[in-house]
């Protein structure tokens, strides 16, 4: 796999012609930033500069092509993107003051699902044909660490997580009402971990020893411990805690607090050591919990006509808004 400075060269695999080496991009990387966000309607990535309460959404990064999908690293310094034209996969990452594109030789086009590891060093790409490609070294020299056969899993696959070493993947699969969580590693058949009514997300934490499983049908958030052996299942939050209409759940970077967003616009915050949950209202209809930079910063909404609604729980929890981007087409060379 080769890396090139986008904007100064173009890779043969993606013919990117990216324009990120200009001063405007270097400037955008020089100050504090909350990370990247996928602009689904615009088919692009946009940077969010600043800090919670004083942040702005920047202009679309000029990739040279539209993207149909993106998985952003938890470190907010890289993203795997899918080219909308030919379904090829590219790695876009920050390096110094520039954005760099790495050509991912051997990576199959058209993944149906992508997932970064908690630390951003590895990723898993799932294909509906029944295979998973594991990428490692994403912070340095990316490589394909292996490929897993998951053709025996029921369909559809609803969620996936991979550990930082890329040594195993957790996959949720099955029809609504009967979804099972499996542990998949090279050289062994998928092993059943537990079964749920539904699984909309799986998040690994505590060095991959524990997983947070979100079951929206049951309005329950579970903690699964030691998925490599006999799994211990613990309920972190349930309907009785007020999370009816559960949309999404995630942990802070330390894995100590669990955040659960519900459709009414409330985010409940649970401490895994116990005690009653805290609650904070969002003047929005949450569509998910999209991690941003910082130990406990999440966007509750995606880019649309209005501002991004962001939960900042790095100290006293609060909701802040990030204004929508000013519409302007990116120009080659990073100049506008």
Segments (PLM) and residue ranges:
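Bacterial N-terminal signal peptides that target proteins for export
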Residues: 1-12
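Bacterial N-terminal signal peptides
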Residues: 10-21
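An edge-strand/N-cap motif at the start of beta-rich repeat modules
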Residues: 26-54
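A short beta-strand motif characteristic of beta-propeller blades
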Residues: 55-65, 99-106, 143-151, 188-194, ...
